[in-house]
Amino acid sequence: MAAFAVDPQAPTLGSEPMMLGSPTSPKTGANAQFLPGFLMGDLPAPVTPQPRSISGPSVGVMEMRSPLLAGGSPPQPVVPAHKDKSGAPPVRSIYDDISSPGLGSTPLTSRRQANISLLQSPLVGATTPVPGQSMFSPANIGQPRKTTLSPAQLDPFYTQGDSLTSEDHLDDTWVTVFGFPQASASYILLQFAQYGNILKHVMSNTGNWMHIRYQSKLQARKALSKDGRIFGESIMIGVKPCIDKNVMENSDRGVLSSPSLAFTTPIRTLGTPTQSGSTPRVSTMRPLATAYKASTSDYQVISDRQTPKKDESLVSRAMEYMFGW
């Protein structure tokens, strides 16, 4: 029977890693846990590679793997990056204070802190950063934001809404018609008179819009449904609810002061309503009501003529007495 002697200098199984460069497993102490550290979410200890004297054909392989060794620079210790322990069991209480923000903070915590800082200073991003000055400096927080008016804000319909508040109640019977040339104002007014009884209309002296007041809200909604309609194959008209409080207040004040100026124009008897006396604009065009009346009326009123009457003077009586006339 042959006896095998064990060489005491020979490396035992498990003392040397299988491949070069693989990290060795950490040694467990006397009070080690039952589960290994990577299952509990612990970070592995940084491993510093130790230089070894290797001769033979494996030297070229090592030089191809690590070109830094050939340059002569000292090897840098491998520091593992922090990973989120979302899949590992908890290792501390949720009420414990985190002392190190780099190791204890998660991406969710850092994202929440960034959102809180942006909410606390909303005017930081509005100012233009100066070269050499931080955007999050306290000097930029108190500066007012400089806004540039857009083309929509320069529009008169947009600026009229700046004076409105949440407590204001607008009259739903008023609509604003815009987008027509000045020469076609009467034509557009005649077209919108077909959608309801127009109580009053106010035209702009220099602009391309007019405010129309209907008798009921239903008629105003019918006019609002014509927004974007093309009239005369060349005029696209826009219709919006009126937000000009001055026009509404002046109209109500004029009705209360002089009720005779409030002129109601039914479409069955009059095609184009005449302007009230409170309107400052003087119309130079011929009213269309005359031609419309003549074409729709069934009866024509003849003006009174000069009819002969009996002379009751003294001379006529004397002649009648003498000659028997």
From Swiss-Prot:
SUPFAM superfamilies: RNA-binding domain, RBD (SSF54928). This is Nucleoporin NUP35. Functions as a component of the nuclear pore complex (NPC). NPC components, collectively referred to as nucleoporins (NUPs), can play the role of both NPC structural components and of docking or interaction partners for transiently associated nuclear transport factors. May play a role in the association of MAD1 with the NPC. It is found in: Nucleus, Nuclear pore complex; Nucleus membrane. Belongs to the Nup35 family. GO terms for molecular function: identical protein binding; nucleic acid binding; structural constituent of nuclear pore. It comes from Mus musculus (Mouse). GO terms for cellular component: nuclear envelope; nuclear membrane; nuclear pore; nucleoplasm; plasma membrane. Residues 65-92 are annotated as: Disordered. The modification Phosphoserine is found at S53, S55, S66, S73, S99, S100, S121, S137, S251, S258, S278, S283. Residues 169-249 form the RRM Nup35-type domain. InterPro entries: Nucleoporin_NUP53, Nucleotide-bd_a/b_plait_sf, RBD_domain_sf, RRM_NUP35_dom. Keywords: Membrane, mRNA transport, Nuclear pore complex, Nucleus, Phosphoprotein, Protein transport, Translocation, Transport. GO terms for biological process: cellular response to leukemia inhibitory factor; mRNA transport; nucleocytoplasmic transport; protein transport. The keyword Nucleus applies.
